[in-house]
A protein has these predicted regions:
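Flexible coil/turn residues that form the inter-helical turn or adjacent wing/linker of helix-turn-helix
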Residues: 20
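Hydrophobic residues on short alpha-helical segments
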Residues: 11-17
Length: 68
């Protein structure tokens, strides 16, 4: 996978998702981000193959982004 420049917000989201599935609202509350900002970052992480939307408003970390 090519080197991707992740923002500090992206890294914080990925760290939370390493612990398990999360909603944007939960991530936003834990890090004092707006829910919209978290949704935007999650969408980018989905597009990059790091995160998968498993249900409406529920996301999880992709175990191996190379497999997406």
């Amino acid at each position: 996978m090519a080197e991707i420049d992740l923002s500090p917000t992206d890294r914080a989201i990925l760290e939370m998702l390493r612990e398990g599935r999360c909603t944007p609202a939960y991530i936003a509350a834990e890090h004092d981000y707006s829910r919209q900002h978290v949704r935007n970052r999650l969408q980018r992480l989905v597009e990059l193959g790091y995160v998968e939307r498993v249900h409406k408003g529920l996301y999880e970390l992709v175990q191996d982004p190379e497999q997406t």
